[in-house]
A protein has these predicted regions:
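Membrane-embedded helix bundles of polyisoprenyl
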Residues: 64-65, 77, 81, 85-127, ...
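Transmembrane-embedded, aromatic-rich helix segments that form part
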Residues: 109, 113-115, 164-178, 312-315
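Aromatic-enriched
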Residues: 233, 324-387
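Transmembrane alpha-helices of multi-pass, membrane-embedded glycan-processing enzymes
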Residues: 37, 41-45, 59-73, 112-115, ...
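Intramembrane catalytic core of multi-pass membrane enzymes that act on lipidic substrates
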Residues: 1-60
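Aromatic/glycine/proline-enriched transmembrane-helix motif characteristic
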Residues: 51, 63, 71, 80, ...
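Membrane-interface alpha helices of multi-pass inner-membrane proteins
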Residues: 99-103, 137-172, 296-303
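Perimembrane helix-loop-helix junctions
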Residues: 168-204
Length: 387
């Protein structure tokens, strides 16, 4: 079965219980995930067979392990950036979006973020060891090179969960390039080329190894973009395209929304890519910490991405939690997370406004009733004690 050839309904049939458990918006979409994510899912499927309950439990345990790994990395990276680890964990790991969506919703971001953050920490530790080594030869500096290789492999694994994980390789590469430029007599372009070649080799080896181990082809490379068929109101580029299309219809020019969306979304991705290049060179110059560059670049990417779900912001919050110490960032994270926790369900779908109002009204009435009962009971108890 090729998960990149068709959606769950086409592959399993509309009557299959597993296919029916997939939300409608994804039921006909081929998988956009890489061999690491699908390989883990395949192992869970072999263990649980067709038991949905057992599979959900194992997938949730896997997500929890990814979040735990990310928590370890955030703690280490926060210490590296001279930031309070407790605050970083509070902003990232204890974020309600993390609990509701990464663990509750079992989204693959838990694995991706765990891999990429642990990988970044290992790469930076490897560079620290290389700086302390008297020589860069493999015979004397092998611990440092081993850590950078393992870190690059984990970041590559993150990209083979979701392709956005590959962004970490760029900032890991620039951190290594900066070290090579300062330590050796290499020119800037040569040190950048050497670091890029090193991590490109790690990437190719990792893709080959995971592809052979999982038996899953390279369909994930060309299968990206299926989610772009969804119009997400959190996407700035999509909002601009939809608003422009609506204005065109109001002016009697016809419905050209789809054509406009292709332009605005492409412009958004290009703008995010240009900003990312700027952050990469800022990292090379030492103006930006690699983790800060990764977090800020990912934040801009999420804002301008064609499709944005509420938990996508965690791509940026996790690395920024270990680096950003401005009060504005903390308050922005708290406000966004609090609002989005009440808007979208863990499975990624929203409820009708009437249903949401009914739920919150019922909760308010229930809480008010309990408070009144508690207040009356407290008054009665006080009266008896006084008597």
């Amino acid at each position: 079965m090729n998960p990149y050839s068709a959606g769950p309904v086409q592959l399993l049939g509309a009557d299959d219980p597993l296919a029916r458990s997939v939300p409608f918006i994804w039921a006909n979409s081929p998988s956009p995930y890489g061999p690491v994510a699908l390989g883990i899912a395949a192992v869970i499927s072999i263990i649980t067979n067709d038991s949905i309950v057992a599979a959900v439990i194992l997938h949730r345990i896997t997500s929890l392990l990814g979040v735990v790994a990310a928590g370890w990395a955030i703690t280490a990276l926060a210490k590296r950036c001279r930031f309070h680890p407790a605050t970083a964990l509070w902003l990232g790991i204890l974020n309600p979006l993390t609990i509701l969506h990464l663990i509750g919703g079992i989204h693959n971001e838990s694995l991706m973020l765990g891999f990429v953050l642990v990988g970044m920490e290992l790469v930076l530790r490897g560079i620290d060891k290389l700086e302390a080594s008297t020589s860069l030869s493999m015979s004397t500096a092998w611990p440092g090179w081993l850590l950078t290789f393992l870190g690059g492999t984990l970041i590559s694994a993150a990209g083979m969960v979701k392709v956005t994980g590959f962004i970490g390789l760029g900032f890991a590469g620039m951190a290594l390039a900066r070290f090579l430029f300062r330590r050796t007599s290499m020119k800037q372009w040569l040190s950048i080329s050497a670091a890029a070649g090193y991590f490109l080799s790690v990437l190719i080896l990792s893709i080959g190894a995971f592809t052979l181990a999982s038996g899953i082809g390279l369909g994930w490379v060309t299968g990206q973009g299926g989610a772009a068929t969804i119009r997400s109101w959190l996407s700035v580029s999509t909002d601009v395209g939809v608003a422009s299309g609506f204005m065109g219809m109001m002016l009697g020019l016809g419905d050209h929304t789809e054509a406009i969306l292709s332009v605005t979304r492409a412009a958004g991705v290009l703008a995010a890519a240009a900003f990312m290049v700027r952050m990469l060179f800022a990292t090379f110059r030492g103006v930006m910490h690699p983790i800060g560059g990764l977090g800020v670049s990912t934040l801009i990417l999420v804002i301008l991405f064609p499709v944005v779900h509420p938990w996508y912001i965690l791509w940026a919050i996790f690395p920024l939690a270990a680096w950003a110490n401005r009060w504005f960032f903390r308050y922005a994270v708290v406000i966004y997370s609090a609002v989005m926790s009440f808007v979208v369900l863990p499975r990624g779908l929203g409820l009708p406004p009437g249903t949401i109002a009914q739920i919150y009204l019922s909760a308010a009435l229930g809480l008010g009733t309990l408070m009144i009962i508690g207040w009356v009971a407290l008054r009665l108890m006080r009266g008896r004690v006084l008597n």
